[in-house]
């Protein structure tokens, strides 16, 4: 056997070369620049061995093929030319793999993403396992980049241009059966026979060429291609609002390769990669990637976590059902639900059943796996089955005496070490723990709705919460697939506190006569996934406005909302999407219909509904209040770092990722510009815009939230 660090070459007795990929000291295989020489040495041996019948590339890791290229390589590039050179080196290496004179097979188990899939595309055939861990995709667009090692050219020719555009523009990942249907892989097999199946495929002298479906062949022609690219450009522009330059470059590069040939396509790909790597959007998106990776590694405290073998949940409603699903089906932990009636328990069980059944229907999991996961969830109307639970999450109504009662009942019916975690969105954790016998085991664990989709949770210790309780709760959040940030026990915590003034200002502009759709469109153009008015409809107007009095009582007038407007809307039985009428009107459930602004809303709040402000003015009024409040949270140590503040805003409320989060955005603007803009807005609209002391100090000292040592790399 010849060993070259991350790549090991073994020639079998049947003259098939097996190249095992195993990056030393890492759980996950990633491609690094220094591996190029190692791979070339192996390729040289393969070319020189005339007896070889074929080659198989396979991972020696337990659950991943290659998860992508090491993103730090891009951060080390000083300019676009260096990044372009990096891409050309990758292209050349993949070309050498493709040019091998014998069949080359990629045997894929686990994640095959980014540079990993580009390497698999350079192989002559691909075969993968039917395991749930096996996913294939090109997610570079999520980092503001495009695939730089030939992916934009090989994928369209393999699966067709429309499928390739969809995969590369969205970064979506295909499961094994989806990849087979798309033509991305040639076979799907059990993991136990992956190597042997790949070897047998490698020994075939002539590999049949795959024919693209008729639709893809039509779209590959000049007329079909022109129509497709025109439609894709229009749809992409609507979706990105021009905020993500990578999407436009992806379309250009793929079109160039199809219209002018592969050579021109590879050249365009490398140049685009180099230029995109230097854009502020890519730098911000990479910063978010590194920050989220760091947060996922952060234990929350220095203490070791306590036992975490089973979980209890109080309340089987919308939040309780969602929490049960992520705990059992993502975390693999047994869950016991308690509700005051069987309907609540049945609701929670049906919640998980519906989500799992959707996965079965889409062939993401088998029915047996659905049943296995559902068996982890049980329920009762009393505390039977709770005595051994390590952590209990309450998801009951926002009522302080009720939550205090829950604490007392858990302490009476559960083990001495059981942690009580409250899913409150507004009540102080210290107040919930006020009468507790073991206050050190009481903590906040704030999920966002819908629980199965929203990636963030806030972990909220109060003054007496122990370090071990924090560590155990953070560990649970990670098992649930969440990104946890630890925040202080102050009114609104972090996410709701910075969101409230943003939504309040949108409502205030409505009272001034601005139109609903104009306000929402302005913030979507700025980069939010939905506008503030639509967000309020989605959350529920009753739910979303409930926290405003709490924040106003804690922080004063800057959190006041036009109370008469909110009252008028709620008194008219407008709750948003959940009851079909809010600021927007919604069609009947189960019937597809486009939401429309209800014109009656203007009469209800006593205005004409005629927009006078520009989109930029609307965005400034909402966003600047959010940024100012985020700076206050930093100053008051509500968040532990700018990193946590950026992650909380991006993952919790959809703050534009291409801006890197509120703190990176404020650093990009500069504290002096922030203070000047806030002062200008304060002169126009009142003292709620007065810049906070933190920003004024930073402007005087020319400081930034992110220190110079905190770059967009993982350090």
From Swiss-Prot:
Transmembrane segments: none annotated. It holds the Pfam family 3HCDH_N. The record marks 118, 140 as: Important for catalytic activity. The keyword NAD applies. One of its GO terms (biological process) is fatty acid beta-oxidation. It catalyses: a (3S)-3-hydroxyacyl-CoA = a (2E)-enoyl-CoA + H2O; a 4-saturated-(3S)-3-hydroxyacyl-CoA = a (3E)-enoyl-CoA + H2O; a (3S)-3-hydroxyacyl-CoA + NAD(+) = a 3-oxoacyl-CoA + NADH + H(+); (3S)-3-hydroxybutanoyl-CoA = (3R)-3-hydroxybutanoyl-CoA. GO terms for cellular component: cytoplasm. The keyword Membrane does not apply. Signal peptide: none annotated. Residues 306-715 are annotated as: 3-hydroxyacyl-CoA dehydrogenase. Coiled coil: none annotated. It is found in: Cytoplasm. Its EC number is 4.2.1.17, 5.1.2.3, 1.1.1.35. Residues 1-190 are annotated as: Enoyl-CoA hydratase. Heterotetramer of two alpha chains (FadJ) and two beta chains (FadI). Catalyzes the formation of a hydroxyacyl-CoA by addition of water on enoyl-CoA. Also exhibits 3-hydroxyacyl-CoA epimerase and 3-hydroxyacyl-CoA dehydrogenase activities. In the N-terminal section; belongs to the enoyl-CoA hydratase/isomerase family. In the central section; belongs to the 3-hydroxyacyl-CoA dehydrogenase family. PANTHER family: TRIFUNCTIONAL ENZYME SUBUNIT ALPHA, TRIFUNCTIONAL ENZYME SUBUNIT ALPHA, MITOCHONDRIAL. This is Fatty acid oxidation complex subunit alpha. It comes from Salmonella schwarzengrund (strain CVM19633).
